[in-house]
Amino acid sequence: MSAAALALAAAEEGGASAAAPDASGKSKKGARPCFRRNLQAGSCMTGRQTPVRRSPAGPRLEPGVLRLNPWKITLRLQGASHLMLSLSSLTAYAARGQWPKKLAQQPPRLEGSQKERSPVV
């Protein structure tokens, strides 16, 4: 049998073999399958293998709509909202000589020399 007859018989049985040359004459042995769900539309045609980038924070919101941050919510529920003050706001307060109310309400710390000591007998 000739090579053409063998190729025709193989195509009838189980489709063309993976190493068969295409119309351009190049072997398609190393061609990768296209996973359409992981790739952008039309990337199989262009040969681009870039996966679709999805935002880890979920869908984009309209401008002006605040996104709820679960970490900040848990801090508020635990009563640690004073920890959420950003460093820039603290430095701005320190530069003006003002402090936020939460920090100003804390009792002043006494140094070792200011503490009342019981006399040693």
Swiss-Prot record:
Q: Which domain of life is it from?
A: Viruses
Give positions of region: Disordered.
Answer: 12-63, 101-121
Q: Where is the composition biased (Basic residues)?
A: 26-35
Composition bias, Low complexity: 12-24
Q: Where is the composition biased (Polar residues)?
A: 40-49
Q: Where is the composition biased (Basic and acidic residues)?
A: 112-121
Spell out the protein name for this chain. Answer: Uncharacterized protein F-121
Species this chain originates from: Human adenovirus C serotype 2 (HAdV-2)
